[in-house]
């Protein structure tokens, strides 16, 4: 069992592991964050060129090194802090405590991915404009990806079982909606801090449409009109 401070819930259901493994194309170099005891790592290794397994827990990393075949490269470190190896695909049962920052880092690499995340986060990723779940994370990820929720997972498929349901999500890269993602993130962070205000009140337009009702395309249009590398969102 992993350290609780890293919010690790290990996949224990082999049928779910098989389902996820079958979503990953064969013969690729794979980055896996949070491999734990290797529930996904080992079956993925059978069909992949190389697995770069990034594990923050040194004890789990040593365990995996003893169990894994030669094409699994175990990297001990914080996936949020280190530079990732060059790879073709990303897989992760993402630790709950780092879900949003890890997804945002993944977006910078633009790797195709299959991730397991909290169901509520998955609902945010596919949320429609004008709904409560729609927000900055929705916009940031869909700037780079088409998002599909493929399967809902009950708590008992993990050990220890989390208190919430999870979801298997496929992220397919699309043409980025902007060139400078860092600036776009700063813009959307400021914009969604006033998510219920109208564009008229924010002096970003003449419409009474509220921030959380804007489509991705409308947000990109605002970004290009009102924001560059030296200024912040006008409010």
Swiss-Prot record:
Keywords noted in UniProt: Cytoplasm, Methyltransferase, RNA-binding, rRNA processing, S-adenosyl-L-methionine, Transferase
Pfam families from the UniProt entry: RrnaAD
Enzyme class of the recorded protein, top EC level: transferase
Xref: InterPro entries: KsgA/Erm (IPR001737), rRNA_Ade_Mease_Trfase_CS (IPR020596), rRNA_Ade_methylase_Trfase_N (IPR020598), rRNA_adenine_dimethylase (IPR011530), SAM-dependent_MTases_sf (IPR029063)
Keyword Membrane: no
EC number annotated for this UniProt entry: 2.1.1.-
Annotated compartments: Cytoplasm
Family under the similarity heading: Belongs to the class I-like SAM-binding methyltransferase superfamily. rRNA adenine N(6)-methyltransferase family. RsmA subfamily.
Functional note: Specifically dimethylates two adjacent adenosines in the loop of a conserved hairpin near the 3'-end of 16S rRNA in the 30S particle. May play a critical role in biogenesis of 30S subunits.
UniProt-listed NCBIfam families: ksgA
Name by which UniProt lists this protein: Probable ribosomal RNA small subunit methyltransferase A
